[in-house]
């Protein structure tokens, strides 16, 4: 780390409890954000991309202190040296710290850690971090005039009123391409693009350093999107703003962002400079997202495609979380008993219905009993012809109407540096330094032969 960071995240988690039954017992947790490490450099734009439901909006709300994390730390305004100090001290127990270290840690937590700051520091954070939401119409009070909407932060934090307040509001409106004639109108009297400009004006009212943009253009027409994006670029250059730009549109990120963080199933799977991630993705998910984005030359090669559906965030896959859907998944990527069962349920629902019992030893070993021996043999044939076959040190064996499963136990994939300024959680990229080539082989149709 060689630059100051507006925001630094260490192992941030947001887990929502799942409650069932009359007594509402907790039976599991939805891992919306699961162990995110991230740093946003001052004056830069970080693009946070991923499919709907990957956790990117939740992560943005956590950074804005609108949602409390269930684990990890969020640090504000750390210098490069302070980031090094935090990384060194955060895993030490108090007994392992020297007196100097303890004093430094106390100072860092009181001044820079969200949740431990003094009230004055929290108030300062509220001023310096603002959010522009996706749906401008629902984020603007329909009963208030533009003057009241944009002027509220000025009344609360700077205690302005009267002509001075109106003058500041008009200045903000003019900054975003509106004017005094819009001061006494309600939100419903504006177009979608104009409402988003009002949201931006409100976010800029207190001269923040950091703005979180949560899909600010996704609800707008393409021509209006371009106007808003150009406005955001101009404002950043004029005011020295730092942006976290959350979107599912890679074309927008390519235009806006200095760096990209790709998010899948609650985790960051790739991070790096925008041009490098587009030119040479180091994670299969990034490659699929990039290739699905149309260009002026037409669509890219679509050989890289994901299979199946997004796994359950209550029980995410072991190893690399993409491996059940990945076109280049290998034995080391983290197959488990749950993968074998979910693959069968998805591709052979009739066969899945013949399963009588499942006796799990652990996540990687189990005994699966079927109604008859034919079902057990069909299950083994399906596993043998699938990409998870090489992940089993002992081939699945049939004993009567039961099948014994044994997979290699693997640890969960983590984000690791692969190249200069490039990080990826792809296990195969970590082994080779590059994304593996896609080898197209004739695929066995698992639905046939049921």
Regions inferred by a protein language model and the residue ranges of each:
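P-loop NTP-binding/switch modules centered on Walker-like glycine-rich loops
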Residues: 65, 216, 220, 224-302
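Conserved ABC transporter NBD signature motif
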Residues: 72-86, 91, 99-112
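Conserved ABC ATPase signature
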Residues: 186-190, 194
